Amino acid sequence: MKGKITLFFTALCFGLTGCIAPPKGLEKERFSINSYREISPQDLTCHCKTVRLGGKIVNTTVLANQTKIEVLSLPVSSISGKPFVELQSDGRFIVYFNGFVEPENLKERYITVGGQLAGTEKGKIEQADYTYPVVQADKYRIWTLSTIYEYPTDDWDEDDDWGFFRWRYRPWYVQPEIRYYLN
């Protein structure tokens, strides 16, 4: 009986681990560079490195045969491939997609992209000059930011005196903890 329980929980753990796999084609092992900080000046000139980067989409421009996206780089989870929303940005990069991608579908969204590092491109961020690393995308996944409001559970403790009709008067409201996640 003990062996069956152990086997059940082991299978359950492996089953739940499979639920957080990265999107197909964006597995960490397929790319030689997996973060913005790993990009060196030599990588930008050789055009031979594959990268997996992610972040928040800042700007989208539709060109004649391709779509150009400016991305505010964020660290990407090595397990799920999702950008970490809470962390500081490493910088910015530009992604080129072959064909047309609807710009309205990309507003206020997050992206994980895999492709070939294709050099640099000069640009501006407001008044400052900036050199963007450029990625020619093969695979990508768009993420939507969702919000959860979590209320503290200690407010409903069984040991509290609930008063008349099993509830007590509260002249204040408990503030929820706001959590963000990508789906």
Indicate residue ranges for each PLM-predicted region:
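Sec-dependent bacterial lipoprotein signal peptides
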Residues: 1-19
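OB-fold and OB-like single-stranded nucleic-acid-recognition modules
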Residues: 19-183
